């Protein structure tokens, strides 16, 4: 009986997570993201990886967090 309840709970959680972001919204990319640059407040890596869009710089906020900021 417990196994059935757990299975139902897990199924409900997975279903709610997939419905949290509409499919069209999840698949849309902005012009800047398609071009390879990162928009404002996105995670970045100052040493490698995609660069921030024009006017933004990759700023290190902590040892584990760098973001594109103006």
Swiss-Prot record:
Signal peptide annotation: 1-20
Domain of life: Eukaryota
Modification type Leucine amide: residues: 69
Disulfide-linked positions: 37-53, 44-58, 52-68
Propeptide: 21-34
Tissue-by-tissue expression: Expressed by the venom gland.
Family, as annotated: Belongs to the neurotoxin 01 (U2-agtx) family.
Functional summary from the UniProt entry: Insect active toxin causing rapid but reversible paralysis in crickets. No activity shown in mammals. Does not show effect on mammalian voltage-gated calcium channels.
Record's protein name: U2-agatoxin-Ao1d
